């Protein structure tokens, strides 16, 4: 079924879409593709006057989740440093709460001018350029 005018589509991407990933390059590429698809979809919606909003959220690594803990362990091993040192080296990693707040902010905002894809860090949302 077609989406109703005013509908929003939120795609869960990853911060790996921005910087790549030496441990999982295919994953990073797939997540970047999601951002391309959101941009293409928004352009088509605008062109056809469908009044749909497509947004991608790309959280950076979230150390307080099970997946994040595995990622921290893998990257720290790869780099030959402790997990604590790896986490300290991360620039403003988001928490689960930061990501939840970002989701709410994006789906409740009526301001379409801020962008279509956002990285989520501990500092909040940053538009992907």
What residues fall within each predicted segment?
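Conserved short-loop catalytic and cofactor-binding motifs
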Residues: 25, 56, 87, 91
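A generic alpha-to-beta junction signature in SAM-dependent methyltransferases
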Residues: 2-3
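A general secondary-structure boundary signal
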Residues: 8, 53-55, 110
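C-terminal helical subdomain
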Residues: 76-129
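Generic alpha-helical hydrophobic packing signal
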Residues: 13, 54-56, 106
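Catalytic loop of short-chain dehydrogenase/reductase
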Residues: 6-49, 58-65, 69, 73
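Rossmann-like NAD(H)/NADP(H) cofactor-binding core
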Residues: 50-57, 116
């Amino acid at each position: 079924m077609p989406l109703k005018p005013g509908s929003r589509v939120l795609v869960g991407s990853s911060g790996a879409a921005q910087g790549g990933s030496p441990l999982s390059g295919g994953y990073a590429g797939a997540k970047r593709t999601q951002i391309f698809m959101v941009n293409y979809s928004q352009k088509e919606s605008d062109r056809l006057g469908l009044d749909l909003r497509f947004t991608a959220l790309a959280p950076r690594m979230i150390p307080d989740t099970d997946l994040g803990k595995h990622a921290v362990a893998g990257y720290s091993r790869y780099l030959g440093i402790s997990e604590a040192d790896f986490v300290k080296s991360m620039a403003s990693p988001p928490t689960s709460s930061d990501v939840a707040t970002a989701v709410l902010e994006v789906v409740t905002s009526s301001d379409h001018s801020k962008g279509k894809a956002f990285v989520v860090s501990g500092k909040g949302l940053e538009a992907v350029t």
